[in-house]
From Swiss-Prot:
Quaternary structure (record): Part of the 50S ribosomal subunit.
UniProt record, GO biological process: regulation of translation; translation
The keyword Ribosomal protein appears for this protein: yes
Function in brief: Binds directly to 23S rRNA. The L1 stalk is quite mobile in the ribosome, and is involved in E site tRNA release.
Domain of life from the UniProt record: Bacteria
Family per record: Belongs to the universal ribosomal protein uL1 family.
InterPro entries named in the record: Ribosom_uL1_bac-type, Ribosomal_uL1, Ribosomal_uL1-like, Ribosomal_uL1/biogenesis, Ribosomal_uL1_3-a/b-sand, Ribosomal_uL1_CS
Entry keywords, A to Z: Repressor, Ribonucleoprotein, Ribosomal protein, RNA-binding, rRNA-binding, Translation regulation, tRNA-binding
Organism: Thermoanaerobacter pseudethanolicus (strain ATCC 33223 / 39E)
GO cellular component terms given for this protein: large ribosomal subunit
Annotated SUPFAM superfamilies: Ribosomal protein L1 (SSF56808)
Name of the protein this chain belongs to: Large ribosomal subunit protein uL1
């Protein structure tokens, strides 16, 4: 893959083989984010788990102290009074079977998070093969199947994100935008890492946090020393 001039210049700013403290790594990532738009800062965490085993799955949610910097569109499946509650709480789309049909018939994906009341899951379940592969299926573990719609919607809008380990044993999450600056990014990073560490499965053996890499949308990866997160 051919790399651009800015990317290659960024590589000269630090030692790609070295592991840095979280503080130093964010400094470097901000210096290497040279694109002419507000780049997202991403975190990739390789875990010492085998995701093929059900007892070594790692997933959860965390509210980023400073949000993601992205405006999040929320779709809610609810009826009656619960639909009114969702609208009042700021949901972007609210409906029931008619929205299930719209997604089935139109392949409609103009939303980032899907929330449903438990009584709607019979209908929403029909969308499993459509929403599942995109990570959009409502799930009680992530707080997106609930009758407390006001709380769920407000948390999501405030910067609640879901994380889950992929087949390769890696968690990918955004921790904010370049424009946040160092302190806010550092606080978001540490909130995510605190949540991931607390999600360690009892069945995981050996070193849990194998490696950490921070990067901007267009920039190179910067390694973080797992012993220098906090």
């Amino acid at each position: 893959m051919k790399r651009g001039k800015k990317y290659l210049e960024s590589l000269k700013l630090y030692d790609k083989t070295q592991q840095y403290s979280s503080d130093e790594a964010i400094d470097i990532v901000l210096k290497t984010a040279k694109a002419n738009f507000d780049e997202t800062i991403d975190l990739a965490v390789r875990l010492g788990v085998d995701p093929r085993h059900a007892d070594q799955q790692v997933r959860g949610t965390v509210v980023l102290p400073h949000g993601t910097g992205k405006s999040v569109k929320v779709l809610v499946f609810a009826k009656g009074e619960k639909a009114k509650e969702a609208e009042a709480a700021g949901a972007d789309y609210v409906g029931a079977e008619e929205l299930v049909a719209k997604i089935q018939n139109e392949n409609w994906f103009d939303y980032d998070v899907v929330v449903a009341t438990p009584d709607m899951m019979g209908a929403v379940g029909r969308l499993g093969k459509i929403l599942g592969p995109k990570g959009l299926m409502p799930n009680p573990k992530s707080g997106t199947v609930t009758f407390d719609l006001e709380k769920a919607i407000k948390e999501i809008k405030a910067g609640k994100i879901e994380y889950r380990v992929d087949k390769a044993g890696i968690i990918h999450v955004p921790i904010g935008k370049k424009s946040f600056g160092k302190e806010k990014l550092l606080e978001n990073f540490r909130a995510v890492m605190d949540a991931i560490i607390k999600s360690k499965p009892a069945a995981a053996k050996g070193q849990y946090i194998k490696s950490l890499v921070l990067s901007s949308t267009m920039g190179p990866g910067v390694k973080v020393n797992p012993l220098k997160i906090f």
